[in-house]
Amino acid sequence: MRLLHHGEYGTKLIGGKCSIDGKLGHPCPLSRRRKKHLREKEMGPQYVRMYGPKRKAIIRTGNPDDGINLPDTGRGTLTAATIWSRAYHSNYSYLVRPKVVTLSKHRELMTTFLLYVLYVCIYISAFIK
């Protein structure tokens, strides 16, 4: 899994699936691209990627358990610019897939389950004696 570093472009997000540089997905219409270029000059590049059916941006601090969900609440309300500025002002440097978060959740569930099984085994063995 490759992380998205500062200064590197991700795919174009909310409100269409075109990309800033035509490599990822189809290129944006020129008018939109021009507007975007002007906006980027004001607030810096937008390097946010969305994944999954609910299109959550996961911002990562370096620890897999620190994934932060910024859900897309309706079209255009949470823009790439908003997510970028939030990430920038919170000093988060990477954006990753939600896979990291789900794996950590599964790990927690597994450890809890195993501890429970161990407890049951000890209880049964004590009861048999």
Swiss-Prot record:
Its main location: membrane. One of its GO terms (cellular component) is membrane. It is a single-pass membrane protein. The chain crosses the membrane at residues 109-128. Disulfide bonds: none annotated. Coiled coil: none annotated. Keywords: Glycoprotein, Membrane, Transmembrane, Transmembrane helix. Glycans are attached at residue 91. It is found in: Membrane. Involved in K1 killer toxin resistance. This is Protein FYV12. It comes from Saccharomyces cerevisiae (strain ATCC 204508 / S288c) (Baker's yeast). The gene is FYV12.
